[in-house]
Amino acid sequence: MSEELAQKTEELSLDSKTVFDSKEEFNAKHPLNSRWTLWYTKPQTNKSENWHDLLKPVITFSSVEEFWGIYNSIPPANQLPLKSDYHLFKEGIRPEWEDEANSKGGKWQFSFNKKSEVNPIINDLWLRGLLAVIGETIEDEENEVNGIVLNIRKQAYRVGIWTKDCDESKLKTVGERLKKVLQLNDEQKVEFMSHDASNTRGAEPQIVL
């Protein structure tokens, strides 16, 4: 089943016509402020595969209609195999710490620790996050957000917002809006950690909201 889902996702990058096959249907488009690229990390099948082998761009889009065509054509969040990821980043930015646009930044993250807690709502949370990011309503005009990530893991399912820097005054606004977008309660916390700190074992988050 995992291989089937991974194959379905990979096939989207082979031919954009698998998503859009009607010029008439998508003739009237509502452009987004930025162009976005969807990436997919497939689960590792052998130890010789590294991160770069597993991370693949799927498709780039620039309108509301294109977004919905893609979203409705790929496996939903709760059907992704373990150790896979979705990444939605502004065009030209790879979802890697080493990318110049990400190297001085970090990520806001919300984690689910129990699988039973995730499945009924993860699709809804992921969609809310996607819409906030492509609509650029989760940030002010500083162009602070680079992308959004969904990680599927055995012990934790995570939704994360990647930022271009670690300016705390800007970060708090993004974190507060993320909580609002995901409709989290006061007991459900989002945490920010810089990418540099994430490389340090046992590092604590810099901000918790």
Swiss-Prot record:
| Residues binding mRNA, per UniProt | 51-52, 97-98, 153-158
SUPFAM superfamilies with a match to the protein in the record: eIF4e-like
Q: Which GO terms describe its molecular function?
A: mRNA cap binding; phosphatidylinositol-3-phosphate binding; RNA 7-methylguanosine cap binding; translation initiation factor activity
Q: Pfam families this protein is in?
A: IF4E
Q: Which gene encodes it?
A: TIF45
What keywords were assigned to this record? Answer: Initiation factor, Protein biosynthesis, RNA-binding, Translation regulation
Its annotated function is as follows: Recognizes and binds the 7-methylguanosine-containing mRNA cap during an early step in the initiation of protein synthesis and facilitates ribosome binding by inducing the unwinding of the mRNAs secondary structures.
PROSITE patterns assigned: IF4E
Gene Ontology biological process terms, A to Z: nuclear-transcribed mRNA catabolic process, nonsense-mediated decay; positive regulation of formation of translation preinitiation complex; regulation of cell cycle; translational initiation
State the family named in the UniProt similarity comment for this chain: Belongs to the eukaryotic initiation factor 4E family.
Describe, as the record does, how this protein assembles with itself and its partners. eIF4F is a multi-subunit complex, the composition of which varies with external and internal environmental conditions. It is composed of at least eIF4A, eIF4E and eIF4G. eIF4E is also known to interact with other partners.
**Which InterPro entries does the UniProt entry name for this protein?**
TIF_eIF4e-like, TIF_eIF_4E, TIF_eIF_4E_CS
Q: Which GO terms describe its cellular component?
A: cytoplasmic stress granule; eukaryotic translation initiation factor 4F complex; nucleus
Q: Which domain of life is it from?
A: Eukaryota
Annotated protein name in UniProt: Eukaryotic translation initiation factor 4E
